[in-house]
Amino acid sequence: FGEDEAQLLTQRTLKVLRHRFVGAPPTVEQVQDVVEQMLVDANHTKTFRAYATYRDQRHRLRQDKRTLVDVASSVEEYVDRADWRVQANANQGYSLGGLILNVSGKVTANYWLSHVYPPEIGQAHRDADYHIHDLDMLCGYCAGWSLRQLLYEGFNGVPGKPEADPPRHFSTALGQMVNFLGTLQNEWAGAQAFSSFDTYLAPFVRNDGLSYDDVKQHMQEFIYNLNVPSRWGTQTPFTNLTFDWVCPEDLREQVPVIGGVEMPFTYGELQKEMDMLNRAYIEVMTAGDRRGRVFTFPIPTYNITADFPWESENAERLFAMTAKYGLPYFQNFLNSDLSPNMVRSMCCRLQLDLRELLKRGNGLFGSAEQTGSIGVVTINCARLGYLFKGDEKGLFARLDHLADMAKDSLEIKRKVVQRLMDDGLFPYTRRYLGKLRNH
């Protein structure tokens, strides 16, 4: 058709748009819907088909642009500190490592949203209906590891990498723990945790015949080394330790093994050594570094049980540290049907009831300490409350839908991470974990 017909159709389109969209401008898709309607009403079938094809091509181009990362702006926004992500993580400073992580993170996040998740799941994140955490990492969220396994087997088993036998001394055990946590942190987005820190290390203190000053010196080295920003992005490894304080019942009669040799004592006979370890840890954390700055990691969790020694000197030190820095988490087992061996605290977002995992078999030490989280999704409840004010039924219907999508996103992530693990992308995780059945 000619120019006059085009002008007429344009005027009709503008009239419809002004009538339909009062007070808010229409979207690109809404404008194109009206254009198609005008072409159909005017019996311009050939033009309608051509326009529909053009529209589809432009839609695909817009989607592709959303996936592409502008290289120049990505680098310059970080260097100029114009990107909000520069200040998004208190554990990451402005640095070359931070720049590398920031740029690669944008690529990885777009890969998740546009090429892994279904369109509806990715769009819900982009529209802020919920937030899928750690999209900048192509891996799982957090993991709790078996300290007993590391001490019994040593840090080894990955082809082409240095291998170490099981540690025979306290200092060696701490050194392997630092290497283990730092290395595994590179294969996970979030926290790395060990449970029963004081229980499992007490045999090394007894066997080496260490004095308290010796223990404290080694503890200083251990804590300092865990706070060095050696993680990708020039970050400090996010580490957690759980302290039993008193030997758990399920370990009291068990005999420790050091370097393949059974010791002439049980875990339950080592309360003195456990007290030394707890005192050393608390005093080093309370003192901080050479400038008195608090050590951020490892974050301690203390199990509060019926036999917790409230009036002891160590308890005084513990609560003085808590008052000064607010460092520890406390796991309260008083008046609870749970016992310390039934719960593992992984990080600030995750606590696991191991009774649920034990239903899947393998026994306590086959599953309990090798647990964690695939990922975290936060639903935008504030928006739901605003949108569905006075409509409780509608609110819960929408919440159910978002929760289902969040669940689906995590199940998809589980399959992706497991496949990548099987293919060797996470060699140390495959060596010490193997499967994500308890995550």
Residue ranges and their predicted role:
Residues F1-S74, Y78:
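Charged, amphipathic alpha-helical regulatory modules used
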Residues Q57-H439:
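Conserved catalytic cores of very large enzyme subunits
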